[in-house]
Design a protein with these regions (language model features):
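Signal-transducing coupling segments at domain and membrane junctions
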Residues: 50-58, 77, 82-101, 121, ...
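GAF sensory/regulatory domain recognition
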Residues: 17-21, 29-64, 84-86, 160-187
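Allosteric cytosolic regulatory segments
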Residues: 136-143
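Short alpha-helical interdomain "coupling" segment at the junction between an upstream regulatory sensor module
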Residues: 130, 144-163
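Amphipathic alpha-helical regulatory segments at dimerization interfaces
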Residues: 1-6, 11-23, 71, 75, ...
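Flexible loop/coil segments at beta-strand boundaries within sensory signal-transduction domains
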Residues: 37-38, 108-113, 122, 126
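A short, aliphatic-rich beta-strand micro-motif
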Residues: 100-109
Length: 187
């Protein structure tokens, strides 16, 4: 409920990573959003110390080419590494050295992958059917919340533009009216 009520992405995404990590006890939770060119999944929020370092340097992964997150961003299907040491797709991130298992879930809006929810644990084999199902439902809710926040921002921008145009039009009309008005009275 908290997630769907927040309207600003800059507040929403860090809130999500904190809540997910606290609720499930994950070592790291990150949210990546696919950029406009669909070339990179860009880290937008993270709760761990390593994640904060990655955020500071603008961490991004190439869609389809780098790690589990890149895989999920390209194919739009969940990916789980129960033991990252045995997963051929896993990207060994030096900022998250304690990761032993990882799950990445697509964030989708109308069948388009807009991002990835990435959760990591310090224990191997931690992911099971129950938390996969729960996190999949949560990923769907996160996707809706992200889309709502984006639509809210677009609506706010459109409203500001309309107000600016209205003020400009009103001012132009008033100036035109003032010039065209002839003086009435005694000479």
């Amino acid at each position: 409920k908290i997630i769907t009520s927040e309207q600003k992405l800059t507040t929403l995404l860090p809130l999500i990573t904190r809540l997910v990590s606290e609720s499930f006890g994950f070592y790291h939770t990150g949210i990546f959003l696919v950029n406009e060119t669909k070339q990179f999944a860009v880290l937008q929020a993270a709760n761990s110390e390593g994640g904060k370092i990655m955020l500071a340097r603008g961490h991004k992964l190439e869609v389809g080419a780098t790690g589990i997150v890149g895989y999920v961003a390209k194919f739009g299907t969940p990916r789980i590494a129960l033991d990252v040491g045995l997963d051929a797709v896993y990207f060994n991130n030096p900022d998250l050295p304690n990761t032993r298992s990882e799950m990445a879930l697509p964030l989708k809006v109308r069948d388009e992958t807009i991002g990835v929810l990435d959760v990591q644990s310090e224990r191997p084999g931690v992911f099971n059917d129950n938390n996969v199902k729960t996190l999949s439902i949560l990923a769907d809710q996160i996707s809706i919340a992200i889309e709502n926040a984006r639509l809210f921002t677009q609506t706010q921008q459109a409203l500001m533009e309309a107000q600016t145009l209205y003020r400009q039009n009103l001012q132009d009309s008033w100036l035109t009216f003032s010039r065209d008005e002839t003086s009435i009275g005694y000479q």
